Regions:
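Basic nucleic-acid-binding interfaces
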Residues: 1-131
Length: 131
């Protein structure tokens, strides 16, 4: 779902980000039914918040996401919403993860983020698709 420009009551904007994050200890656990459920949860979260996801790739040990959202929230707030919501549900639905992950989080603390301009967008989309 791509949007060229979004409009607010007094704003017009187009802000896209390439975000990457990993499970705790970079464990290779994001596959099969867990990866499918994770994708569903991310899509739901993005839809509920009225953001737009242009591309996603879930690898065994990391996630790539190309996302557009309103600039009224910070990048760190957006990442916290995605990671926090998915962590809780995935840990509840896949209790066998306790064997690999200690503590109360599925995700490592940090993340990578870069802004994506119009010129770079197709390059980033192809990169994510080819992961």
């Amino acid at each position: 779902m791509e949007k060229k420009y979004w409009s607010g009551s007094q704003t017009k904007h187009r802000v896209k980000y390439h975000i990457v994050w990993t499970p705790k200890y970079r464990k290779r656990i994001l596959d099969g039914k867990l990866a499918e459920r994770l994708k569903e949860l991310l899509e739901e979260c993005i839809e509920v918040n009225r953001w737009a996801m242009d591309e996603i790739s879930i690898q065994k040990d990391h996630i790539h996401l190309l996302i557009q959202f309103v600039p009224s929230i910070s990048i760190s707030e957006m990442v916290q919403i995605l990671k926090g919501g998915t962590s809780r549900v995935i840990r509840e639905e896949f209790p066998e993860l306790k064997e690999f992950l200690w503590g109360s989080s599925l995700w490592a603390d940090g993340y990578f983020v870069e802004s994506v301009g119009s010129f770079e967008e197709n390059i980033i989309q192809k990169y994510i698709q080819n992961q």
